[in-house]
Amino acid sequence: MTALYWQTIGEGERDLVLLHGWGLNAEVWSCIQALTPHFRLHLVDLPGYGRSQGFGALSLAQMTEIVLAAAPPQAWWLGWSLGGLVASQAALMQPQRVSGLITVASSPCFAARDEWPGIRPDVLSGFQHQLSLDFQRTVERFLALQTLGTESARQDARQLKAVVLNQPTPSVEVLNGGLEILRTADLRAPLAELNLPLLRIYGYLDGLVPRKVAELLDAAWPNSTSQIVAKAAHAPFISHPDEFVTMIEAFIAAH
């Protein structure tokens, strides 16, 4: 039986599940240790990533089912980028177990469609093709894209790269599966029906999730809350950890 890597830290009474993004692992959350006095943090390496080896390419529903199987019975869920889709899917599949949902630099539909801003599908397909040719360079390029434009871009990209290199790396099959989820998932309609506290955090400079998404979802999901970190890109918790932690604490405390 292939098992997921989970780690629980923190002294708080509320449970908070943290889900990382594509290509990364749970070590990416080390910069927000300030949450530990307030929450019991449940850190997981998604199936096939980091220390959760032995999985192949999975659909969004399959990945979410595997995570839910070992997640705490009741918790807040926070997901970054691809992890935001998994956290959202968990809330759709088992809403009774999700106290509230926080998505970070995430979109219910990452690919650009008709009137919807996002990553061009051919760019995502290109990444899939490049992975098979030059694994290391493609992952590095994707990490660099995540921090582009911020004052601390180089330093932040180095931090992300260290997270990848310090743990077992995902296979090309797993990474392609993740890109396929980003290319095809569209949770806009089902999430509009979700009746849970929902906070969406964005980076103003994010090149992967355009800030226009925040505005469109403000209109489509009026019961949700959005916050934009002015000088952040795709990893606001790395470039602006204090501001990020304050947002999380305030939102959960209010609910």
From Swiss-Prot:
GO CC annotation, single: cytoplasm
Catalytic activity: 6-carboxyhexanoyl-[ACP] methyl ester + H2O = 6-carboxyhexanoyl-[ACP] + methanol + H(+)
Gene Ontology annotations of biological process type: biotin biosynthetic process
Organism: Serratia marcescens
Subcellular location: Cytoplasm
Function, as annotated: The physiological role of BioH is to remove the methyl group introduced by BioC when the pimeloyl moiety is complete. It allows to synthesize pimeloyl-ACP via the fatty acid synthetic pathway through the hydrolysis of the ester bonds of pimeloyl-ACP esters. Also displays a weak thioesterase activity. Can form a complex with CoA, and may be involved in the condensation of CoA and pimelic acid into pimeloyl-CoA, a precursor in biotin biosynthesis.
Gene Ontology molecular function, alphabetical: carboxylic ester hydrolase activity; pimelyl-[acyl-carrier protein] methyl ester esterase activity
Active-site residues per Swiss-Prot or TrEMBL entry: 81 (nucleophile), 206, 234
Start and end residues of each AB hydrolase-1 domain: 16-241
Alphabetically ordered keywords of this record: Biotin biosynthesis, Cytoplasm, Hydrolase, Serine esterase
Protein family membership: Belongs to the AB hydrolase superfamily. Carboxylesterase BioH family.
NCBIfam families reported in the protein's UniProt record: bioH (TIGR01738)
EC number: 3.1.1.85
Superkingdom of source: Bacteria
Pathway assigned to this chain's UniProt record: Cofactor biosynthesis; biotin biosynthesis
Quaternary structure annotation from Swiss-Prot or TrEMBL: Monomer.
SUPFAM superfamilies listed in its UniProt record: alpha/beta-Hydrolases
Gene3D superfamilies found in the cross-reference section: alpha/beta hydrolase (3.40.50.1820)
Name the record gives this protein: Pimeloyl-[acyl-carrier protein] methyl ester esterase
Residue numbers binding substrate: 22, 81-82, 142-146, 234
Pfam families membership: Abhydrolase_1 (PF00561)
